[in-house]
Amino acid sequence: MGKAKAERRLKDNEAQAVARTLRVSPQKLNLVAAAIRGKKVERALAELEFSRKRIAGAVKKTLESAIANAENNHDLDVDALVVAEAYVGKSIVMKRFHARGRGRASRIEKPFAHLTIVVREVQAAEEAA
């Protein structure tokens, strides 16, 4: 198994939210996470609001949680937040059987994924760069 990885330390101008065991494949979740990575939070929320992907609602909820953590726990300015990181991790894979013809069965895999969103407060000089 090895040694457990150390958690990433947050800087003073960062806040994060984690959604664990989302019922979606990591590959599909990463498509939505990549769409908001590096954007201002209000722009990212607007993109998630109108996204046609099924998992966009859960990603939006996690982003709103990260924004609330930044405001309430870290006293950061909500208007100056950007999505610094949005990354996806693999979780469990549930195995199910699907009955087929002639008494056979095939395996269905139902993957799960973890989502971590880190928001960072930036100053006006950093936004222009």
From Swiss-Prot:
GO BP, one annotated term: translation
Highest rank taxon of the organism: Bacteria
Similarity comment text for this entry: Belongs to the universal ribosomal protein uL22 family.
Cellular component, GO, one term: cytosolic large ribosomal subunit
Any GO molecular function: structural constituent of ribosome
PANTHER family reported for this sequence: CHLOROPLAST 50S RIBOSOMAL PROTEIN L22-RELATED, LARGE RIBOSOMAL SUBUNIT PROTEIN UL22M
Keywords: Ribonucleoprotein, Ribosomal protein, RNA-binding, rRNA-binding
Organism field: Rhizobium etli (strain ATCC 51251 / DSM 11541 / JCM 21823 / NBRC 15573 / CFN 42)
Keyword rRNA-binding listed: yes
Disulfide bonds: none
Function text: This protein binds specifically to 23S rRNA; its binding is stimulated by other ribosomal proteins, e.g. L4, L17, and L20. It is important during the early stages of 50S assembly. It makes multiple contacts with different domains of the 23S rRNA in the assembled 50S subunit and ribosome.
PROSITE patterns registered for this protein in UniProt: RIBOSOMAL_L22 (PS00464)
Identification of the protein by name: Large ribosomal subunit protein uL22
Listed InterPro entries: Ribosomal_uL22, Ribosomal_uL22_bac/chlpt-type, Ribosomal_uL22_bac/org-type, Ribosomal_uL22_CS, Ribosomal_uL22_sf
Record's subunit section: Part of the 50S ribosomal subunit.
